[in-house]
Amino acid sequence: MNINDTVERVTDGADLTVDEAREAARLVFEEATEAQIGALLAALRAKGETEAEIAGFAQGMRDAARTIEPDREPLVDTCGTGGDDYDTINVSTTAAIVAAGAGVPIAKHGNYSVSSSSGSADVLEVAGADVEAEPPAVEEAIETDGIGFMLAPVFHPAMKAVIGPRKELGMRTIFNVLGPLTNPAGADAQVLGVYDPDLVGTIARSLAHMPVEHALVVHGAGMDEIGIHDETVAAEVDGDEVREFTIAPEDLGLDRAPIEAVSGGTPEENAADLRGIVDGSVTGPKRDLILANAGAAIYVAGETDTLAAGVERAAEAIDSGAAATKFAALCGDDEAVEGDGEAASTDSAAASTTAGPEDDD
């Protein structure tokens, strides 16, 4: 198999198998020229990427990544594609911290912002976290603190090969959806937001081809998160089975609120909201939005039998101080962590623009 033959086949309308797509990704990262990469990406876009092709490219991207193997399970990631319609508070990042407070081991994959005001790396950097930590340090953090952050450019250096072709093409390609599928810690469970409701089923069926045990793929009426302003389109992946459904805020025991009530701002403003939500001083719609998404992470980890029960556990993690303790650990505030033994015990009881998740918050 060579890249030119693959481009020709895809241009003629042929679909690649998972294994063929995985090999095509290897060729992209190791051998292909920028012209060949651009031709393949454009051909896939014109044909329409299949679930098998997305899964194969994701596995090929994982093959090329710097990976870690923390001795914690089930590892959970809360990572979206970015590219949605709203600049909200940093949802997936805050939700990950709250879920960690509920005892869920978190391997958070993220990046700096591309087009939104504040990506996951932007807000965590402002808060004091070492967002560019090397793989061994992140592995240790997950094992010791129950939460670690993996910056996409640090863990996916092979993605440099596609920077030029993607910029020149100037359109969305298969790589716009791959970041959340390529967790370098091999997360067992995920809450994965997508920018287009039509992608929910496609990405869920792609995950069913991959070694992920339990996942929720969601689109919340314009958000790549579970929303509280309207119903969320969702697909649950349990092994190789996929179930599509909708989530209403009322199903989670939460009130609806207009999208404007959860608007974000600069990284500094979003970091202040993050801190306030995890320490309990920020309430109302912003807290509820985080509870919805943290509850989903707790659910896919197998800690609860329902999403609504996950929301209740998320609220307990905030109210007990456990979420604030995890935030302090992520930001390297050892004094705060050591000073809150009760909250800490909850865990034991229970080139950035193209390298991975884009605008994930």
From Swiss-Prot:
UniProt-recorded name of the protein: Anthranilate phosphoribosyltransferase
GO molecular function (one): magnesium ion binding
Subunit composition and interactions: Homodimer.
Keyword Transmembrane helix included in the entry's annotation: no
Free-text cofactor note: Binds 2 magnesium ions per monomer.
Catalytic activity as recorded in UniProt: N-(5-phospho-beta-D-ribosyl)anthranilate + diphosphate = 5-phospho-alpha-D-ribose 1-diphosphate + anthranilate
A GO CC term assigned to this protein in UniProt: cytosol
Chain residues that bind anthranilate 1: G80, N111
GO BP terms: L-tryptophan biosynthetic process
Function according to Swiss-Prot or TrEMBL: Catalyzes the transfer of the phosphoribosyl group of 5-phosphorylribose-1-pyrophosphate (PRPP) to anthranilate to yield N-(5'-phosphoribosyl)-anthranilate (PRA).
Catalytic EC class: transferase
Residues engaged in binding Mg(2+) 1: S92, E225
Binding-site list for anthranilate 2: R166
Species this protein is from: Halorubrum lacusprofundi (strain ATCC 49239 / DSM 5036 / JCM 8891 / ACAM 34)
Annotated segments matching region Disordered: 338-361
